[in-house]
Swiss-Prot record:
Subunit relationships: Interacts (via C-terminal domain) with MND1 and HOP2. Interacts with XRI1 (via C-terminal domain).
Protein encoded by which gene: MIP1
Coiled-coil stretches: 390-648
Name by which UniProt lists this protein: MND1-interacting protein 1
Gene Ontology MF terms in the entry: zinc ion binding
Length: 711
C-alpha cells in the first residue's frame, strides 16, 4: 500500500472497476459496443421503463440485459434485431471486399446465398455461405443449413434479406419452443446474439409481460458512478475478458452473460511501490521501504483470506434464514465485525513498519500543511465510504424485503396447491398451470436469495476497500516523513551548490580577463586583414586592366586577321575573274586569227584569179583594180596591227598588269606572271608549298624563268 503523496493527489478516489482488456479489442467489437450503446440511449427514456417516467442509471447498470430488453415492445425488439443484422451484413460485405471481390459481386453473393444459419456465429456463417456461392461460380440456388432454398436471383436488397432471416430464425425458435410468443422469441435471439441454438436454451423471465419486476443479476456493476456498462448489453461472447487482476497471475474477475463475478472474496489491487525521484531517497531507504510494504501486503492478504472464510460461513447461514428479521441480522452483524477487524489489522500492520528514526528537525509549517492536506483527503474518503455503506445497506434491505414478500407468496401458493390437490382429476390443466406458477415463484425466490448474498458480498468488499483506504492514509503519513527527510538532504545539496557557485564565479572573472585580451588580438588581426584586403583590391584592379588590354589586343588581332582573310578572298575572286577573261579573250583572238588566215588564203587565191582575169580582160579600166588592191592592203595592215596588240596583251603579267611575263609553270606550261610577282606569289602561298596556277588552278610542281628579246 505504498501510495505516495503525488498519487493521492492524482487519484483521490478508489472505485471498484471492471477488468480491462489486456490488448485493444478488435474493431468489430468496438463497433458493436458503440451500436448497442446508441440503442440503449434511445431506450433509456422509454415511457414504460419506470412508473414515474424517470430513469436511474445505477439501476440500469445493475441488470442491463433484463432491465432494458425486458421492457422493450415487439416493435423495438424487431428494430434492434434488424439493425444488428444490417450491421452484420455490412461487415460481411466489407470482409468480402477485403478478400479481393468487387462490391457488386460481393453484394450479389450476400443477397443470393448470404444466409445467417450455420454452426458458427452469424457473421462467419454469412461470409462462409457467400464464399461457397462465389466458389461455385455464382450459379444455381444456394441453400441454408435449415433446408430453406433460394433461387440465384436472391433478394432485391439487404433489407428484404434481413427481414427474411429474422422471420426464419423466429420461426425455427418457435418450432423448438412452441410456447414462445414472437416477442419472447426476439428477446431470446437478442440475448443469445442471434444464435438459435443458445436462444432455445434461454428461459424467458416472467417480467417480460408485466414490465414491473426487476431481477438484479449484475449487482457488482454498480460502482461505475452512473455510467452505462456497454459490455452487459452485448452477447455473452463479447463478455469474456482475459487476463488477471490483482497480485500475482491469477485472481482476476471473470465476466459471464449474467454479469460480473469474482474468483476471490475481495478485489486485490496491484500497485507498484513508486519512490518519486524528487525525494532523492537513498538505495538503502528504498529497499527498506519496499520490504516493509511487501511484508504489510502479505500479512494483510493472509488476514483477508481468513475473513473471507468466515464471511462464506455467514453467507451459508444467511441462505438458511427464512424470516426477514433473521436475514437482516445475518447480513449486517458479520459485516460490522469484519470491517472493524480489518481496520484493526491494517493499523497493526502499520505499527510494524519501521524506518530510520534519525531524522533531523524540520520546519513545523511544512509538516502542518502536509498533515492538513492528508486530513482533508481522509475526510473525503470517509464520506465516500459512508455513502457506499448506505447504498449497500439500502440494497440489502430491499433484497430482504423482497425475500419476505416472496416467502409470503410462497406460503399462499403452497396453500393454494394443497387446495387444488383436493379437487377432481378433471381440473388437471388448472393444476398444471398452478404447478408451473409455483415453480416460477420458487425460481424467483432462489434468485432473490442469491441477490441478497451478492449484496452482502458487495458490502464486505466495500468494507475491505475502506480498510485499504485507511491503510493508504497511514502510508501517506509515512511518505510525509520521507518527504521531510528528502527536504533536509535537499538543503545540504543546496549548500554544496552555493560553494560550487562561488568557485564558478571566480573562474568566470578569470575567463573574462582572458576574453578581453583575446578581443584585443582579434582587433589587431582585423586591421591587418583590412590592409591585406586593400592591397588585394589594388592588385585585382591592375590585373583587370591588363586583362582588358589583352582582350583589346586579341580583338585587334582578330580584326586584322579577318581583314587579311577578306583581302585574300577578294584577290582570289579578282584573279579568277581575270583568268576567265584571259581565256575568253585568248579564244576569241584565236578564232579571229584562224578566220583571218582563212581570209588571207582566200584573198591570195582571189588575187591569183584576179591577175589571170586582168590578163584576160585588158579592156577593164586600171582604176578599179588599184582600188581593190588598196582595200586589201588596208585590211591586212589592220589585221596585223590587231594581232600585234593581242600578242602584246597576252605577254602582260596578270598580277601587276605592267611587266612582261617571264615565268613558266610546270606541268601546265602557263606563262602568266613576271619574275617579281612570281616570287611574291610563291611567298604568300605557304612559302611555295602547294602553289596553284592562277590560270588553271592546277598544282605547280616547278617554275622556270625565261628570258626573251626584251628581258
Amino acid at each position: 500500500m505504498g501510495c505516495t503523496v503525488r498519487e493521492k493527489h492524482v487519484k483521490p478516489t478508489r472505485r471498484i472497476k471492471a477488468a480491462a482488456f489486456r490488448s485493444d479489442p478488435p474493431l468489430c467489437w468496438v463497433e458493436k459496443i458503440a451500436m448497442s450503446q446508441s440503442i440503449v440511449e434511445n431506450l433509456v427514456y422509454h415511457p414504460g421503463l419506470t412508473d414515474s417516467g424517470s430513469v436511474n442509471l445505477n439501476s440500469v447498470t445493475e441488470n442491463p440485459e433484463e432491465n432494458f430488453w425486458a421492457y422493450c415492445t415487439e416493435e423495438h425488439l424487431e428494430e434492434i434485431l434488424l439493425k444488428h443484422l444490417e450491421f452484420l451484413y455490412n461487415q460481411a460485405v466489407s470482409k468480402l471486399l477485403e478478400l479481393g471481390y468487387e462490391e457488386r459481386v460481393a453484394l450479389k453473393a450476400v443477397l443470393s446465398n448470404g444466409h445467417c444459419y450455420g454452426e458458427l456465429d452469424v457473421l462467419t456463417n454469412i461470409v462462409n455461405n457467400s464464399l461457397s456461392y462465389l466458389n461455385s461460380g455464382g450459379g444455381g440456388g444456394g441453400s441454408n443449413g435449415n433446408g430453406e432454398d433460394r433461387t440465384e436471383t436472391g433478394f432485391t436488397d439487404l433489407r428484404d434479406l434481413e427481414e427474411y432471416s429474422l422471420a426464419g430464425m423466429i420461426y425455427l425458435l418457435q418450432q423448438v419452443k412452441p410456447n414462445l410468443s414472437k416477442g419472447d422469441a426476439m428477446w431470446c435471439l437478442l440475448m443469445s446474439e442471434l444464435h438459435v441454438g443458445r436462444a432455445s436454451t434461454l428461459d424467458v423471465p416472467t417480467n417480460r409481460s408485466s414490465c414491473c419486476t426487476k431481477e438484479d443479476s449484475n449487482v457488482e456493476d454498480v460502482g461505475t458512478g452512473g455510467t452505462l456498462d456497454i459490455a452487459g448489453f452485448m452477447a455473452p461472447a463479447l463478455c469474456r475478458f482475459h487476463g488477471g487482476w490483482g497480485f500475482g497471475n491469477g485472481g482476476g474477475p471473470e465476466f459471464s452473460g449474467n454479469g460480473f463475478s469474482m474468483k476471490g472474496a475481495e478485489l486485490k489491487l496491484q500497485r507498484e511501490i513508486d519512490c518519486p525521484k524528487r525525494f532523492n531517497l537513498s538505495p538503502s531507504m528504498k529497499s527498506l521501504l519496499k520490504r516493509n510494504v511487501a511484508a504489510f501486503a502479505a500479512g494483510y492478504r493472509a488476514s483477508m483470506k481468513q475473513k473471507q472464510i468466515q464471511s462464506s460461513d455467514t453467507i451459508g447461514d444467511s441462505k438458511a434464514c427464512n424470516d426477514p428479521a433473521i436475514v437482516k441480522s445475518c447480513g449486517q452483524q458479520p459485516r460490522k465485525s469484519g470491517s472493524e477487524e480489518s481496520v484493526s489489522t491494517v493499523l497493526e500492520k502499520f505499527r510494524d513498519l519501521n524506518l530510520d528514526d534519525n531524522l533531523e528537525s524540520v520546519g513545523v509549517d511544512d509538516k502542518d500543511c502536509v498533515i492538513v492536506d492528508l486530513l482533508h483527503q481522509v475526510k473525503d474518503f470517509e464520506k465516500k465510504v459512508k455513502e457506499r455503506k448506505e447504498w449497500a445497506q439500502k440494497n440489502a434491505m430491499q433484497a430482504a424485503q423482497k425475500v419476505s414478500e416472496e416467502l409470503a407468496e410462497l406460503k399462499t401458493l403452497s396453500s393454494e396447491r394443497e387446495g387444488i390437490q383436493l379437487l377432481k382429476k378433471g381440473k388437471q390443466a388448472v393444476e398444471e398451470s398452478t404447478a408451473k406458477r409455483f415453480t416460477d415463484k420458487e425460481i424467483e425466490l432462489r434468485k432473490a436469495c442469491s441477490q441478497n448474498d451478492r449484496a452482502n458480498v458487495i458490502v464486505r468488499k466495500l468494507e475491505n476497500q475502506n480498510a485499504e483506504i485507511r491503510a493508504e492514509r497511514e502510508g501517506s503519513k509515512l511518505s510525509a516523513s520521507e518527504s521531510l527527510k528528502a527536504c533536509m538532504e535537499a538543503s545540504k545539496k543546496e549548500k554544496k551548490c552555493l560553494k560550487k557557485l562561488v568557485a564558478w564565479e571566480k573562474q568566470i572573472l578569470k575567463l573574462q580577463d582572458e576574453i578581453t585580451a583575446e578581443k584585443e588580438k582579434i582587433k589587431a588581426l582585423y586591421k591587418t586583414l583590412a590592409q591585406i584586403t586593400e592591397y588585394e583590391k589594388e592588385i585585382e584592379a591592375k590585373w583587370r586592366q591588363e586583362q582588358k588590354a589583352k582582350e583589346e589586343a586579341l580583338a585587334q588581332m582578330e580584326e586584322e586577321q579577318r581583314s587579311k582573310e577578306a583581302a585574300e578572298g577578294h584577290n582570289k575572286r579578282k584573279l579568277e575573274t581575270l583568268r576567265l577573261k584571259i581565256e575568253l579573250d585568248f579564244q576569241r583572238h584565236k578564232d579571229d586569227h584562224q578566220r583571218l588566215e582563212q581570209e588571207l588564203g582566200r584573198l591570195k587565191a582571189s588575187s591569183d584569179s584576179d591577175s589571170s582575169h586582168i590578163s584576160n580582160n585588158a579592156w577593164k579600166p586600171k582604176k578599179s583594180q588599184g582600188e581593190n588592191i588598196a582595200k586589201l592592203l588596208e585590211e591586212i595592215d589592220k589585221l596585223e596591227g590587231s594581232y600585234d596588240n593581242e600578242a602584246n596583251y597576252d605577254r602582260e603579267c596578270i598580277i601587276c598588269m605592267k611587266d612582261e611575263v617571264s615565268v613558266v609553270f610546270l606541268p601546265c606550261a602557263h606563262q602568266v606572271v613576271c619574275g617579281s610577282c612570281s616570287d611574291s606569289f610563291f611567298a604568300s602561298n605557304n612559302g611555295g608549298s602547294k602553289v596553284t596556277c592562277p590560270c588553271c588552278r592546277g598544282l605547280v610542281q616547278q617554275r622556270i624563268r625565261i628570258f626573251g628579246a626584251t628581258s
